[in-house]
Amino acid sequence: MSKHQTQVVGDFTIGPEIGRGSFANVYKGYDNRTKAPVAVKSVFRSRLKNQKLVENLEIEISILKNLKNPHIVALLDCVKTDQYFHLFMEYCSLGDLSYFIRRRDQLVQTHPLISSILERYPSPPNSHGLNKVLVVNFLKQLASALEFLRDQNLVHRDIKPQNLLLSPPVHSKEEFKRKGYSGLWELPVLKIADFGFARFLPSTSMAETLCGSPLYMAPEILRYEKYNAKADLWSVGAVIYEMSVGKPPFRASNHVELLRKIEKSKDEITFPVSAEVPDDLVRLICGLLKANPTERMGFQEFFNDPLIVYDVQCADEPLECSNVDEQLFISEYLPNLKTSPPAKPAPETIKEESEEEERAERAPTDSLLIGKEADLRIPRPMEGSGKDEVIKKLINKSSPPPDTVKDGQIKKGARRDKDDFVYEKDYVVVEKRTVEVNAIADELAKAGAGAVAIPSPHLGTNEHSAANPSGPTETQTQRRFSPSSRTSSIGSNRRPSWGDRKMPISISPTNALTKALGYTSNRLFGQQQQQPQQAQQAAIESAITNVTTNLLATKTLRPLKPSQETSLEDTEVINQLELLATMAHAISLFAEVKFSQLIPLPPSSSSPGSADYDEMYQNDAFPPQMVKSISSEGVALYVETLSLLAKAMSIASDWWHQNSSKPSTSPKLNDLVQWIRSRFNESLEKAEFLRLRLADANEQLVGESGSSLNKPVVAEKLIFDRALEMSRTAAMNELKNEDLLGCELSYSTAIWMLEALLSNDEEPVTGNEKLDAEDKKIIELFINSIGNRLKVLRQKIDKQGVRS
């Protein structure tokens, strides 16, 4: 539905858009029966791509239906259509608290009510915060709502200014008392909204799910420790600080840096002198912003704080609001802005560290932490792959913060970046391979005989599987990549891998794969034949992912000798698929670091659709420019991943076209193909999410002040730089004889990332080579250099007996 259309749904008419997010848009509407204004949260069904997201929405609906409190936004009705879940909610015409804080200087000139409020209760000179009376008013109302939630054993888990909505003040003190409001009757009324993360949590219970917005997230959640309802009190402290000062207490470009800053502060909260924050507010804020939850102020102490219990001196007279139209949304009073309020509050990102601080940040002892302190918000693709998390930590520790907005980067009226269109084309090319990828996977899944037949995983089958059951067509099977092509991993024209050039293979990767699959097959087809199909597929995928991840840490692959189980021809294909799958896995771990920066998830979460896949709500803490930077890099990396996986599936397709007459297929080959199909669909889904975030960020930048003029994102450069940075960090650790196994993993992953650049050296759109001869020569030199380092390191590890 466009911004200017009206649509009748049930007893309501939906009007213009007043806000938007990745999963829902918010519209202004009205009740056809009473003509009263309403807010309509329209959630896109198409973007709820897994059951967990649907469950979150249903939880929000069920909670709101049963919550009746004057300081909680009321749910009036809910209507489901083919395209949307429409939530008709109480209309708060003054927008959210964040918008009120950020836009008050403009609103004071155009909005009669805001002008009257700030004239009566002005902010301190040179302060970006609010007057103490306003802060205490909102604080009392927030405390009232939280006390109600505590009585219901509910924890909100996403308290932030963007979720605190404001309604105009009531018209009399009598009406204020009759409706049960807290605070000051002549001032705006604050209401808590967005219960998508809320859950029932008795006071003695602990939770461990990561949710909420990073800038307001309690440190125990950032550390992945179990937490209780007191996590909400940290968020309250951060909100009070922002009301008083005009910015969050801690700001950073990523979650790890945010936690580092919180811990570095040692509970010493700094307040700008210009903010003139009163002592009693300072005391309350410092009591709430205790990093250790056991030292943090408790709920009863908070509810009994003098600022909340005692009345504050005020004018006790109604504000001048005779010219206020309470049905107009607050942003409509700013004629130069779009109807939709701009993006959620844009926190300033950290300034560049000095060179000495940067070197300290990269110190070897800090680069490879594997404890809770180093945990990152990274979605974990498969439960069985513990090394994946280590690799992503290594990648992230080597990651500089995303580019921040600098002066001159934004120009009004600028067109969209050219590289946006380039990556759109690349994305479309790999997206079009979806049907082909799933078609060949379906065919191979059906081709087994007897006990060796492997069931299709059906991951995304409804959306992605080919509709043609008769098998791939001629055009589907004759792909650009074949076993004899230049880009194939074996054959006379194959570029020798680093393993071929430098060292013998002591452990056959495919033997490792055979053992893993043999164990899995015994469970599937031996004593546990009645195992549910979903559990079977989880076991298969876990085994494949374990092996693929292990290949990152073991020797690079070589053509293998035939075994009794597998023919030479099958072995060659399996070898090629393992090579490409491992390269794709290495790049996808890098891509998921970017993905996780916009969607914070716990490391225990698994693939989309699983019960542990946490809320995929957008990260509202980042300004549009940073979202653009992160998402564009993520899309570029996922395109590289998808290209490698598509190439692997093309090889499988060519093999199947020549061998479809065989009575059965190799279980190992089949499992690899199903794993590749699953990874392709998962990567495509995540790339699509990032692409939508990129489009939203571009629209916000164009709407506010023009598009950014960033340097174009080049996936090859991202991968190359990160591989070298990981190697440098590993070398520093190795010299200090620290975390040698982590060094081995860093070196190995770096080699695979560089090998992927050489293997995937072709533009998806034009077919031209991405790298020139000089680039390839440089990459080869680094592969050899890192490989030599890895060989020496492994000798040291074996000599010291570190593995044991």
UniProtKB/Swiss-Prot annotation:
Pfam family, one: Pkinase
Chain spans, region Disordered: 339-364, 395-415, 455-506
Group of enzyme by EC: transferase
Active site: D158 (proton acceptor)
Annotated ATP binding sites: I18, G19, R20, G21, S22, F23, A24, N25, V26, K41
CDD domains: STKc_ATG1_ULK_like
EC number assigned by the record: 2.7.11.1
Any single Gene Ontology cellular-component annotation: phagophore assembly site membrane
Biased composition (Basic and acidic residues): 404-415
Positions of the Protein kinase domain: 12-308
Compartments reported by the entry: Cytoplasm; Preautophagosomal structure membrane
A molecular function GO annotation: ATP binding
Known catalytic reactions: L-seryl-[protein] + ATP = O-phospho-L-seryl-[protein] + ADP + H(+); L-threonyl-[protein] + ATP = O-phospho-L-threonyl-[protein] + ADP + H(+)
Keyword set, alphabetical order: ATP-binding, Autophagy, Cytoplasm, Kinase, Membrane, Nucleotide-binding, Protein transport, Serine/threonine-protein kinase, Transferase, Transport
Entry-linked SUPFAM superfamilies: Protein kinase-like (PK-like)
Membrane topology: Peripheral membrane protein
The protein's assembly and partners: Homodimer. Forms a ternary complex with ATG13 and ATG17.
Biological function: Serine/threonine protein kinase involved in the cytoplasm to vacuole transport (Cvt) and found to be essential in autophagy, where it is required for the formation of autophagosomes. Involved in the clearance of protein aggregates which cannot be efficiently cleared by the proteasome. Required for selective autophagic degradation of the nucleus (nucleophagy) as well as for mitophagy which contributes to regulate mitochondrial quantity and quality by eliminating the mitochondria to a basal level to fulfill cellular energy requirements and preventing excess ROS production.
UniProt record similarity statement: Belongs to the protein kinase superfamily. Ser/Thr protein kinase family. APG1/unc-51/ULK1 subfamily.
Protein name (Swiss-Prot/TrEMBL): Serine/threonine-protein kinase ATG1
Organism: Pichia angusta (Yeast)
Gene from which the chain derives: ATG1
